Amino acid sequence: MIQTFNDAQQKVWFDDALLHEDPSQCCNPEFWQQNGKVLGSATGRGTTWFVQLQQTQGALRHYRRGGLFGKLVADSYWFTGWEKTRSYQEFMLLNHLRDAGVNVPRPIAARVQKHGLLYKADLLSEKVPNARDLVSILQESPISDELYRKIGREIRKMHDAQVNHTDLNIHNILIDDQEKVWIIDFDKCYVQIGDSWKQGNLKRLKRSFEKEVCKRGINWSLEAFAIISSYKHEE
């Protein structure tokens, strides 16, 4: 069940079935470091910390801006209401997707720290075990047509839940050791009615394949993408 913790510095929403640690501390990397619970990290726009919870493993991410504006205001956003904050919206969207049967990480906690007219945000979600992103897999070898079909089916489930993934790319598709497909990173994504926008998600995904062919020499072809994009014809 989703619970809420408040104090003078922050507001935290958390799933009490997954979080047995102190909700006031769960989004502080120092808390996990001091308790020897940091398993590793990954660096992208910022650092994602992989941590050991009592019940599961988590991925802790601090929200940061990209682009030129991000160099000026790295991690602060205008506050226009608790339910409009980045971490709360991603936390709730992940719950919506889980309820719809889409393979996404279970959200554990979302934090907002309000400072006057601005806020900072963090998200703690479950780490997908034994999984790699599609880029690293395709750098080593091609994947089967059946695995491409699985990717297409997962996108279909996401679209059936009417979720617009505004940054759908092959870094945000994970494959675990059971060849189960996962979709991650739903920051700034949202529920949208209709169908016209769905093709835009697929076009963005196609561009990411083409980019990584040039950048990293991944094993990929247009025929493989045709298998993914055929998802909309499946029942």
UniProtKB/Swiss-Prot annotation:
Q: Which residues form the active site?
A: D167
Q: Name one GO cellular component term.
A: plasma membrane
Catalysed reaction(s)? an alpha-Kdo-(2->6)-lipid IVA + ATP = a 4-O-phospho-alpha-Kdo-(2->6)-lipid IVA + ADP + H(+)
A Gene Ontology biological process term: lipopolysaccharide core region biosynthetic process
Q: What is its EC number?
A: 2.7.1.166
Specify the superkingdom.
Bacteria
Q: Which GO terms describe its molecular function?
A: ATP binding; protein kinase activity
UniProt pathway: Bacterial outer membrane biogenesis; LPS core biosynthesis
Keyword line: ATP-binding, Cell inner membrane, Cell membrane, Kinase, Lipopolysaccharide biosynthesis, Membrane, Nucleotide-binding, Transferase
Membrane topology annotation: Peripheral membrane protein
Q: List, alphabetically, the NCBIfam families matched.
A: PRK01723.1
What this protein is reported to do is described as: Catalyzes the ATP-dependent phosphorylation of the 3-deoxy-D-manno-octulosonic acid (Kdo) residue in Kdo-lipid IV(A) at the 4-OH position.
What family is it from?
Belongs to the protein kinase superfamily. KdkA/RfaP family.
Which protein, by its recorded name, is this? Answer: 3-deoxy-D-manno-octulosonic acid kinase
Gene encoding the protein: kdkA
